[in-house]
Amino acid sequence: ALKIIDGYDFVIDSKKIKTYSRYMLLAGTGIVVSSISIALYSRINQFLLGAVDSVSSVGIYSVAVTLGTSWGFISQSLITSFYSRIYSEKNDSVSINLAAKLNRLVFFISLLFIAVIFFGGRYILEMLYGPSYISAYIPMVLLSIGSLLSSLGTVAYRFIVKYSGYYFLSKKMSVMLLISIPLSFFLIKPYGITGAACSTIIIEFISLTFMNYFFCKGIIFNMHKASFLKWW
């Protein structure tokens, strides 16, 4: 179709418009669904704690979540700034090596914060919340490990987005949501808030590794190999 706007002729290809519209719909739907799934399964533990354990456990667990994941914004900021270079890179092997370097950087920065929480967590809890919240210490340490896995998961997530894996992400997050509900229930019932924290680690680990390895002939597996089997 020919359109004239301000004296200029424009040819509008209806087939291309349909193609790009479908692509944008699928891409947007994938990101929205995966984002909702992430938000949901990160809150499942709190809901199940309230139902299976007690309201006080929810309060203690909320403190553990707040402190154990409080440093996550640092790694997220680092990932966001680093990925502009990765997205602009056309060579797959170079992209994998850049993502692997970012993976290692996020890993070691996360280890630093985990060490701070491990050695200073009890003092921080007593200072901020009082001795009645000391029971949040072990879940807090476990959740800091979960936050490390989540940060590494963001590196993989962004790498999948680079290769337009929006539909894959939406399916993966939906599957993880279905897995997390029974897993959290069976761990929370006998172990309470510690079980809730353990379920977070298990879910984040499965999401980071096995589930991602199905994408694009194991490109995430190759990135992980480059991260920890080959150094700078």
Feature annotation, model-predicted:
Residues 30, 45-47, 57-75, 105, ...:
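Alpha-helical transmembrane segments of polytopic membrane transporters and translocases
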Residues 55, 119-148, 194:
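Interfacial segments at transmembrane-helix termini and the short loops linking adjacent helices
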Residues 145-172:
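Membrane-interface junctions at transmembrane-helix termini in multi-pass inner-membrane proteins
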